[in-house]
Amino acid sequence: MNIFDRKINFDALFKFSHITPSTQQHLKKVYASFALCMFVAAAGAYIHVVTHFIQAGLLSALGSLGLMIWLMATPHSHETEQKRLGLLAGFAFLTGVGLGPALDLCIAINPSILPTAFMGTAMIFTCFTLSALYARRRSYLFLGGILMSAMSLMLLSSLGNLFFGSVWLFQANLYMGLVVMCGFVLFDTQLIIEKAENGDKDYIWHCVDLFLDFVTLFRKLMMILAMNEKDKKKKK
């Protein structure tokens, strides 16, 4: 029998039998909201970089933080759903604006960094998300303690580097941060599944977790590519 004659069963490929139908519906809402966040964040970044109508700064950072706190403080219900979606969109927009200075820096070094970083982030995020969805339930939840310890270590080293100014330590933090965020994609995806299985259907807040994972991954990868490109130019 010719192996190329075999048909691929796509229904079986995307079948998550270990996840209940209600949780699968919840995940659809989470990723639909995530897609909305990506679109709105892209609009925010575009406005900063191209139109300069709104510039990233202290006000945009405080606005983003304020909207996130407001969203967190607003209880999830059918009555507040539209309001919370509006808060989510506002948060995503200001987060996109906040990426502006990093985008400007990368464009100045090499504009091709941006599509490369975005495609790389999308591939990493998709692969680790699928790994978490296909894996046995709760199999990655043990990562929580490890990831928080790693984040604490990175924070301490970053604070220490304010005094030492070590380029090597800065680079190590970037690469370690990239690995840690990959772990958070696994952890957060499975945590969302477990929360949904236990009755927590707040898909808007669950979307925030994944959106922040993606944005942080993108920022780390973008900075790594920019740093490597700058080193190449110095060698030339």
Curated annotation (Swiss-Prot):
The chain crosses the membrane at residues 30-50, 53-73, 87-107, 113-133, 140-160, 167-187. InterPro entries: Bax_inhbtr1_CS, Bax_inhibitor_1-related. It comes from Bos taurus (Bovine). Residues 207-227 dip into the membrane without crossing it. Keywords: Apoptosis, Autophagy, Calcium, Endoplasmic reticulum, Isopeptide bond, Membrane, Transmembrane, Transmembrane helix, Ubl conjugation, Unfolded protein response. This is Bax inhibitor 1. CDD domains: BI-1 (cd10430). The lineage of its organism: Eukaryota, Metazoa, Chordata, Craniata, Vertebrata. Its main location: endoplasmic reticulum. The keyword Calcium applies. The keyword Coiled coil does not apply. Residues 1-29, 74-86, 134-139, 188-206, 228-236 are cytoplasmic. It is a multi-pass membrane protein. GO terms for molecular function: calcium channel activity; endoribonuclease inhibitor activity. GO terms for cellular component: endoplasmic reticulum membrane. It comes from the Eukaryota.
